[in-house]
């Protein structure tokens, strides 16, 4: 092909020859940067709220953004302030994960402080996820690592781990951190529709950094090398 061919050939008939208006350029930019958010809203099942729950736009936005980060980085911080419904947001993200990975392919572990045990169990039940979930208080993680404890699936069977009040695991030298890190970083023994053997981790906290940036670093080590 020669330069003359380009000038006289069929390439001249493409849209590239036309003038692009500022408006068209703006729309193209929006699609490039935000198309994943637009498409994500089509997955309505995750946003179907059970009776007694209200749907808020900020929660829907948080689910879309959080889920995108979960798939891209294998984990993320859900760090809204107190009272904005982090439990519901995390549950909706877990539901979207189940939809995409396949419910029967998915096992979830929720790690929580004892004071909020009922809240987590009730919310997961309301959203229809309790069948695919085990719940453990943040001081009893050794039970998950005990292969003879049949109240829990083996640690390598979990696909998604949710950690409430994740700032309690900011110290990498204590036993609880070591146990949680082992659970989170133990490869999935089987995968569902979502590929990859790394577990997905959601760290939930209103105060992810209590003292120094080292707090964040240690918590990130729960899902990153």
Residue ranges and their predicted role:
Residues 75, 159-160, 200:
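The start of beta-strands in P-loop NTPase/AAA+ ATPase cores
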Residues 195-212:
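Conserved helicase ATPase motor motifs in RecA-like P-loop NTPase domains
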Residues 1-81, 88-100, 105, 122, ...:
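ATP-dependent helicase/translocase motor core
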Residues 1, 169-170, 207:
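Conserved RecA-like P-loop NTPase helicase motor core
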Residues 216-224:
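A short helix-turn-beta junction within AAA+ P-loop NTPase domains corresponding to the substrate/partner-engaging
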Residues 43-54, 64, 86-193, 225:
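SF2 helicase/translocase NTPase motor core
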Residues 81, 113, 207:
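P-loop (Walker A) phosphate-binding loop of NTP-binding proteins
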Residues 76, 108, 202:
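Conserved beta-strand position immediately N-terminal to the Walker
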